[in-house]
Amino acid sequence: MNRQRLLKIWCLKKLGETHRCYSSAGDPTKLINFSEFTPEKIRNFGIVAHVDHGKSTLADRLLELCGAVPPGQQQMLDKLQVERERGITVKAQTAALKYQGYLLNLIDTPGHVDFSAEVSRSLAVCDGILLLVAANQGVQAQTIANFWLAFEKNIQIIPVINKIDLPGADIKSVETQLKNLFEFNSEECLHISAKSGLNVEKVLDAIVERVPAPTANVEAPFRAMIFDSYFDHFRGAIAHIVVKEGSVKKGDKIRSYQNDKSYDVSEVGVMRPEMVKCTEVRAGQVGYLVCNMRTVKEAVVGETLFAAETPKESVQSFAEIKGVKATVYAGLFPVETADYESLKQAVERLCLNDPSVTVTPDASKALGLGWRIGFLGVLHMEVFGARLSQEYDASVILCQPSVEYRAKIKDNENIRKKRYDGMEEVRILDPSKFPEESDVDSFLEPMVKVRMIVPNEMMGTVNGLCSECRGERGEISSIDTSRLMILWRLPLAEVAVDFFERLKKLTSGYASFDYEPDGWQETRLVKLTILINGKEVSEFSQILPAAMARDRAKTLVQRLKREIPRQQFEVTIKACIGSSTKALSQIVIQPMKRDFSQLLKGNFGGGGMERLNKKLSHQKKGKERMKMVGNIQIPKEAFLNVLKN
């Protein structure tokens, strides 16, 4: 099969259908010219799937078959170091492919639920998608979520069953699942092996035949939408665009709709999958544009770019790409306070490439200036931290994540006006701003609707986990003869941190899950405070539902015991609720003792024992005084290790 594929690539190259092109900035005649591809000859499509169903492998085979990369290359569209290390797709990537007289613009998307915003943003560019399902795993939770994302946008969906050459592949079962869940007939499903290349040519043919051409007008003045962007240290913000009308080339003058700024275009091109300069990017095509945008706020996702000579009043801006609301929040601080400014710049630039992140300034007595950052999940948070380290060489502290809560303030004008700026409902993200319980009618916590696909025999185990997480059971439906789809309504606080890890452990990795926001629910919130020798250390305070307080208290106290060095006096660590001094969990770190028997050289005769007891008595009284007035030495590393995720 590999020899046949290589032979086909060689023949296509001979016929001039496909070729790898390189450009020279100094010679315009050597730039790639895509003007031959009218909108009717363009197909913009994406690949969506659950994690580990073969998206990146299929993308590699498509790149090979279209001559964009040499055979044998792997993870060509996973360009970030964190993607290659973890084996997951984090950022959607594009590639322009030539195939039998057509220009196919491929958008590869992530599969993890934490990066659903990337999928949603990519679908704004696509006219069709490949819905990839592994034959040995079947339809999973994220498969269903991705289908409905595309269905709601009225995008053509092509079902593709991958990994058909594996011993555990069950093609008939997967076809039944696709029929029952999405009403796909078996004739619509393509059967492939992305790893070996089996039947991948049929995927390209199906894209040409089934995906509609983009709606575009080449004759109209230039108008395009930014669907992604990133910051280059030398060229500024580089915008990935889909051109809806007209064309753009080097030297053109363009304007942005929201910022109302004018720019001179210095470079245009396409991704193949690396950046390749072109003579122009025309209506219907997907490419990139460089125009000396020097601040990260100028290349926001969803921005409309148009020809500078076109009156702004006559330009129709594109519908805003809806952002996905953050689900978890965590403090982010530089390890060294002197690095604050450089880290601030790195955070701003990375947020340009990841607009789903929300940033607000924060400060800590122990850690200095920093930010409270909102993420779409814990994996999203970990990847953000890894990218700061790998791409910007930044050393950061990411604190324990939490979720947003709300408080309904009592209907009392004095309370609302004096303490809460007249608001009836306040957001709670920071423990230091936790409202007085006497001011609050009720607390609210965010809820999510969780969709899980589990083997039949593990339903009881999974239901037990969800009940333990304060959940409400929903519908149960059959996927096939061996698997069930279970719906539960759970508090986001239970899901956001370690629910998936616990689910995988209980089901030996056979379960998958996806979740979506499902309103708010009344709860009893508490502020967990840490007292060290009776003094509150605000950096360790946390807000959480009362049902989770005892377990979290034990964890924090144990961490602190490991991190705080022994002192000359006894140190008592207590975890309490609010201003109460009653401990949920308590540990005592015993003091260091001075061995007076060594000083007295073991000579206890002639009153030696009395002298020893006298010394020990003096030591005890001295330590009592130190405990009352002394400051406990808590090293900065203790804050880092206790607060970090």
UniProtKB/Swiss-Prot annotation:
Report the PROSITE patterns cross-referenced here: G_TR_1, G_TR_2
Which UniProt keywords are given for this protein, alphabetically ordered?
Answer: GTP-binding, Hydrolase, Membrane, Mitochondrion, Mitochondrion inner membrane, Nucleotide-binding, Protein biosynthesis
At the top of the EC hierarchy, this enzyme's class is hydrolase
Task: List the subcellular locations.
Answer: Mitochondrion inner membrane
For the ligand (GTP), the binding residues are 49-56, 108-112, 162-165
The residues forming a coiled coil are none
* EC number, as in UniProt: 3.6.5.-
Q: Where are the transmembrane segments?
A: none
User: CDD domains, from UniProt?
Assistant: EF4_II, EF4_III, LepA, lepA_C
- Name the catalysed reactions: GTP + H2O = GDP + phosphate + H(+)
Q: Which Pfam family name is an example for this entry? A: GTP_EFTU_D2
Q: Which GO terms describe its cellular component?
A: mitochondrial inner membrane; mitochondrial matrix; mitochondrion
Please give the chief subcellular localization of this protein. Answer: mitochondrion
Where on the tree of life does the source sit, at the highest rank?
Answer: Eukaryota
Q: Which family does it belong to?
A: Belongs to the TRAFAC class translation factor GTPase superfamily. Classic translation factor GTPase family. LepA subfamily.
- HAMAP family membership: LepA (MF_00071)
The name on file for this protein is Translation factor GUF1 homolog, mitochondrial
What organism is listed for this UniProt entry? Caenorhabditis briggsae
